[in-house]
């Protein structure tokens, strides 16, 4: 996949901007931010952590779209095309459920897009996180996660990075915005993630799962 940082046409840039401005409307479906005391109050395309994937997908559809990018199998990732949910905001939706859970309870849900220019991802990441900071500035029990860049352990060459910022709830769950910048050593497009994660899944991510 190309990692070229070439100029994106004006129309593509405007589309990219509209997608991520609309992200905030999609995620935050509460009447007021002051009611946002539980990570389960937030949704992506009408779905959230704690829901069963079976409410939205058949078991066959789930099994047909399982991914394999964790080095252990505590959680199972599933990628579904955004168009399946009639999404105009995300190219893919990622779910994570616990291995062996026949109810397919969602522990993490993300909306994904694949920016052609990683710098556009960084710009939109800052805008979204600034909006979130303002929206929840007076809400107790929420801690800001400043933007930081890390090496992505999926790339053993050490050339790939992910940049993350977000909000951490006192219950341990988190809302994060990530830009994944993959090197040519990794057969993957660059990614922008908007994620809702439970405390348990956040702990899993911090355990170097790749």
Task: Label the predicted regions.
Residues 1-16:
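Short, Lys/Arg-enriched N-terminal segments with co-localized hydrophobic residues
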Residues 36-79, 103-210:
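Non-cytosolic coordination micro-motifs
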Residues 7, 30-33:
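N-terminal compositionally biased, intrinsically disordered segments and leader/signal-like regions
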Residues 19-31:
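Sec-dependent N-terminal signal peptides
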Residues 81-105:
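Compositionally biased P/S/T/G-rich terminal and signal peptide-adjacent segments
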Residues 15-18, 193:
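Position-driven detector of the extreme protein N-terminus
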């Amino acid at each position: 996949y190309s990692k070229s940082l070439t100029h994106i046409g004006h129309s593509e840039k405007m589309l990219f901007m509209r997608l991520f401005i609309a992200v905030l409307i999609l995620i935050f479906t509460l009447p007021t931010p002051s009611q946002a005391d539980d990570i389960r109050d937030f949704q992506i395309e009408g779905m959230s952590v704690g829901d069963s994937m079976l409410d939205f997908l058949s078991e066959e559809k789930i099994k047909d779209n399982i991914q394999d990018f964790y080095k252990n199998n505590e959680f199972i990732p599933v990628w579904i095309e955004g168009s399946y949910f009639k999404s105009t905001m995300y190219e893919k939706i990622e779910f994570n459920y616990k291995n062996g859970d026949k109810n397919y309870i969602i522990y993490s849900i993300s909306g994904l897009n694949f920016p052609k220019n990683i710098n556009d991802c960084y710009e939109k990441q800052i805008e979204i996180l600034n909006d979130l900071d303002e929206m929840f500035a007076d809400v107790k029990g929420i801690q800001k996660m400043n933007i930081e860049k890390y090496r992505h352990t999926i790339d053993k060459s050490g050339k790939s990075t992910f940049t993350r910022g977000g909000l951490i709830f006192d219950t341990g769950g988190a809302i994060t915005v990530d830009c994944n910048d993959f090197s040519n050593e990794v057969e993957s497009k660059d990614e922008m993630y908007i994620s809702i994660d439970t405390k348990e899944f956040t702990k899993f991510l911090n355990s170097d799962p790749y």
